[in-house]
Amino acid sequence: DDFVLKTFAGKTFMDVFNAFYYSWSPAVAEAEYSNPALRETVKYMIYPLIGSLQLSRIAAEPLAAVSSELSVISAGVVVSNLLGIIYLAPISLLVRRFLLSRKRLPVTAPRLAWLMMVLLPILATAVYFQNGAVVAFASSALVLGGLCLGCALPYTIAKALASMRSR
């Protein structure tokens, strides 16, 4: 937390994240308190989150020598992709397999990667000029894009591998 909160981008994003998180987490905490099985489930589901946060920090640490802002933004991109892969991709693959097997979805990994590449200079410019509103928007959009990209990557990779095998 301290690593993130020492930067303008990190603090601004955490303000947005905390507003979102604390809008629903008290209800979950209350449900956990009265349900030991739910408490155990949540406990085990948090382990990958903690590991992802640690990995993203390790991956971004070398960039701190260049810029702490760049380091925090990189950590956010890494962790959002990892969380998309860990938490969203399995659900997405099941939904795609059983409910949307014949439909072509317009959201693809290359489009999401393009979106993230567009957001990065917007975020960098907003950080440079210390524009809190744009940083809040761009950092949140970047994290959501990273979650979606992480969600789309396993399907994209599996599809590419299947295509290579069929040649």
Positions of PLM-derived features:
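Long, compositionally biased charged/polar accessory segments in the mid-to-C-terminal portions
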Residues: 1-167
